[in-house]
Amino acid sequence: MVATLFIDADACPVKDEAYKVAARHGYKTFVVSNSWIRVPATPVIEQIVVDAGPDVADDWIAERCGPGDVVVTNDIPLADRVLKAGGAAVAPNGRVFSHDMIGSALASRSIGEHLRSMGEVTKGPAAFANADRSRFLQALDQLVVKAKRAAPR
C-alpha cells in the first residue's frame, strides 16, 4: 500500500510546505485544482487539473482517498468524506479534522451558510498567520508519520 497525500490546491496557502513534507517522507502527492498551478518537477508530485465547478476537485479527491492517505483541505464536507473513507485530513491552519469534531464543524458551517443566505453578516476566518503555517507543518508531519507507521509492510 502506497500512502498518498492529496492537496485541495485551489486557494491553499501551504502548498509549498506540503510539498516539502511529502518529499521528506516519499509520499506520492496529487495537487488537485481547477486551474494550472506550478508544482515542483519531481516524480512524487503530480498535478491534476479538474473541470471548473463546485466540488469537482473535492469529488476527485474523495473518490480516490482511502486508509493511510492524508488530505490537505479547508473544506469541511471534504474532510468528512475523507474521514469516512479512512483517511486523515488537516486544514492549512493546522487543524486536524477528527471523527469527534467533524459533526459540530459541519453543523457550524451549515448555520453560517443559513445566516448568510438570510442576509446576516457573519465574520470570516481570521487572517492566515505564520503561527498557522507552523501548526500546519507540525500537524501534517505527525499525520504522515502516523500513517506510515500504520501501513502494512
Curated annotation (Swiss-Prot):
Signal peptide: none annotated. InterPro entries: UPF0178 (IPR003791). It holds the Pfam family DUF188. HAMAP family: UPF0178 (MF_00489). Belongs to the UPF0178 family. This is UPF0178 protein CCNA_01273.
